[in-house]
From Swiss-Prot:
Component of the NOP7 complex, which is required for maturation of the 25S and 5.8S ribosomal RNAs and formation of the 60S ribosome. This is Ribosome biogenesis protein YTM1. PANTHER family: RIBOSOME BIOGENESIS PROTEIN WDR12 (PTHR19855:SF11), WD40 REPEAT PROTEIN 12, 37 (PTHR19855). It is found in: Nucleus, Nucleolus; Nucleus, Nucleoplasm. PROSITE patterns: WD_REPEATS_1 (PS00678), WD_REPEATS_2 (PS50082), WD_REPEATS_REGION (PS50294). Keywords: Nucleus, Repeat, Ribosome biogenesis, rRNA processing, WD repeat. The gene is YTM1. Residues 253-262 have a biased composition (Polar residues). Its main location: nucleus. It comes from Phaeosphaeria nodorum (strain SN15 / ATCC MYA-4574 / FGSC 10173).
Length: 471
């Protein structure tokens, strides 16, 4: 005997944040069957909007959560009485992003960044970036930074650094403005480069010394000319991109300072012409390598750092004090701020993303846990067009897209709400489900730009751009 199907109806008020998709006033409150699912409600909305011949797939949210079942199942699971009027929001469903193009490198691509009208560096540059003139920055394990156009042409490549024969692999690179680039890596040095669009050159303008081991990450703030670096030596350093504002560099950290073994390099290269400076401040407190560092989006006097010691720390930069420490259960590999929710997203070695409320008043460490990756999550960025979107890059060879409203049940005690990804992007040319959790296709860096799309780089020696059709 088949189970009885409920014919209960419930009152629902439909709203949207898209000004072009508002329903007529008389159609905003409807009596709907609780048997309906998302696809049924999407069809009804298209009919009410007069879009039968040009349908838009809609996602449906009830009380801020995606509807993934029937309305009846949602009401039962959340303990909502059918007599309650539901507040239903409809929004364009996120279309799976398609591969637009890929750019080949000679070595692994460790980091990517985008300069566009809508990027932070574009905004810091006073609107000088024109539509159609977007630039992509890449850092590679060959020790070089490159600037590309969106057609895949290399516009400029930096010269190999004069670093005394140290390992030159880069780990991080950021646009500071349309004319300045900051990059750092395994030779312990943070470099500021001048990018000249007219001559298509990238030249080193400043070298910054503070770390004794490799630099894992850099963060930049254009308006204040400040740079943060996170290092494997367990420290964080603060610099200025203006040479005169920094102190003299420690002589013990300079390459070719006294080493006789580098005599041949000294003879073959001119004396140092690039200014060398030290740090304004060095922050200690982590007990293991610091993997990531960011400025607080609305207050550049505050920074957050993530470490293999399982902690997220909040720093007051003017006083060089750690003002808060949040301890998790796993090594933290990446960071991203979500200002609209007052949360910090942290990628972990345990394959998930933990959303942490860093405010001192917060009583719960993990507000939400996002699961879906099969290896460490090493790069994060937010959706530039939404307060709810997040993108992650992992050593499992995938980039995953998340919507924080996509909440599921279950999970372990203390992990808060659970979320799962809405789309997965594989490396272009990767056949089948993938090579053993990212073998040969690890993703090292990802950026989400409103104009360019989702840009990622990795072990396959490629920059890959994905974008939703029509965006």
């Amino acid at each position: 005997m088949e189970p009885e199907i409920s014919d209960t109806k419930v009152t629902a008020r439909f709203t949207t944040r898209d000004e072009n998709l508002h329903l007529p006033d008389q159609d905003r409150t409807l009596l709907i069957s609780t048997n309906l699912k998302r696809v049924n409600l999407s069809k009804i909305l298209n009919e009410l909007l007069g879009r039968e011949d040009d349908r838009i797939p809609f996602d449906i949210l009830i009380n801020g959560q995606f509807l993934r079942t029937t309305v009846d199942e949602y009401l039962t699971k959340n303990g909502i009485n059918a007599e309650t009027r539901l507040e239903v929001e409809y929004t364009r469903a996120l279309v799976p992003p398609l591969n637009v193009t890929s750019f080949e490198h000679d070595d692994w691509v460790s980091a990517v960044d985008v300069l566009s009208q809508t990027s932070r560096a574009g905004a810091w540059s006073g609107g000088s970036v024109q539509s159609g003139q977007e630039r992509i920055l890449s850092a590679s394990y060959d020790g070089l930074v490159r600037v590309w156009n969106t057609s895949g042409d290399v516009l400029a490549t930096s010269e190999a650094p004069n670093n005394g024969g140290r390992i030159t692999s880069l780990k991080s690179a950021k646009w500071l403005s349309d004319k300045k680039i900051v990059a750092a890596g395994m030779d312990n040095t943070v470099r500021v480069f001048k990018y000249d669009e007219d001559t298509r050159t990238i030249t080193t303008s400043l070298e910054l010394f503070s770390h004794r081991w490799g630099v894992e990450d850099v963060a930049v703030h254009g308006p204040s000319s400040r740079i943060l670096s996170a290092s494997s030596d367990n420290t964080i350093s603060l610099f200025s991109s203006n040479a005169k504002e920094n102190p003299v560099a420690p002589s013990s950290l300079l390459p070719n300072s006294t080493a006789a073994s580098n005599k041949r390099q000294k003879l073959s290269k001119p004396d140092r012409t690039v200014p060398a400076r030290g740090a304004l401040t060095t922050f200690t407190g982590h007990s293991s390598p610091v993997s990531s560092v960011i400025f607080k989006p609305d207050d550049a006097t505050v920074a957050y750092s993530a470490s293999h010691d399982h902690t997220l720390k909040t720093w007051d930069l003017p006083t060089a004090q750690c003002v808060d420490t949040r301890t998790t259960g796993h090594s933290l590999l990446s960071l991203c701020a979500i200002p609209s929710r007052n949360l910090i997203a942290t990628g972990t070695s345990a394959r998930h993303i933990t959303l942490i409320d860093p405010r001192v008043s917060a009583t719960q460490i993990s507000v939400m846990t996002l699961r879906g990756h099969k290896n460490g999550v090493v790069s994060l960025d937010t959706d530039p067009s939404s307060d709810h979107g997040l993108v992650s890059g992992s050593h499992d060879g995938t980039v995953q897209i998340w919507d924080l409203r996509n909440v599921t049940t279950g999970g372990q005690v203390g992990e808060g709400q659970q979320g799962e990804s809405v789309h997965t992007i594989h490396r272009q040319g990767q056949s089948g489900p993938g090579k053993g959790h990212g073998e040969g296709v690890k993703v090292f860096g990802v950026r989400w730009d409103k104009d360019v799309g989702i840009v990622s780089g990795g072990e396959d020696k490629k920059i890959q751009i994905n974008r939703a059709l029509g965006s």
